């Protein structure tokens, strides 16, 4: 049986597709100029759904896809009911607390204003620190928020730290180490067990 796999558009999809080609699950890459969001590989092993990164887990959880590849940060933020059997060790980054130079948590005595795309993980971080915070959920350009007075600090993904540095921000703490995870809904993990196990075993040999 064919596996339907949800992939996030962008760099992680490209890395995932390269990995599957190297393992013999795909014969070729989808046409980068195509507007089609479903790719049926000629080998007949995999059908790919190209979706937004935040939507991968929903497609899998609701059985619109058997499996998906998603960042650990997205999975932890959403709290999805999925099997997460494999860390693919690609798409590595970290979710970090960052702020302008001079800001410290210890010296902050009022409610801390935090801008982030990850309100649940940010709230949990400050709760465990015993600090009160006000969360502003943003969808992009998170680094801008403390520069214009919207927030005191940010919680955002960091790869190299170059964007933080360019905007006068420094990394204060790492909240979560993230990488791409292969996820399955439990129905497909049972109903397509042979294909699922073969797929996992193949990708685990990186």
From Swiss-Prot:
EC number(s) on file: 2.4.2.17
Q: Which gene encodes it?
A: hisG
| Family under the similarity heading | Belongs to the ATP phosphoribosyltransferase family. Short subfamily.
| Pfam families referenced in this protein's UniProt entry, alphabetically | HisG
Q: Which UniProt keywords apply?
A: Amino-acid biosynthesis, ATP-binding, Cytoplasm, Glycosyltransferase, Histidine biosynthesis, Nucleotide-binding, Transferase
Q: What's this protein's name?
A: ATP phosphoribosyltransferase
State the superkingdom.
Bacteria
A single Gene Ontology molecular function, please? ATP binding
Q: Which organism is it from?
A: Leptospira interrogans serogroup Icterohaemorrhagiae serovar copenhageni (strain Fiocruz L1-130)
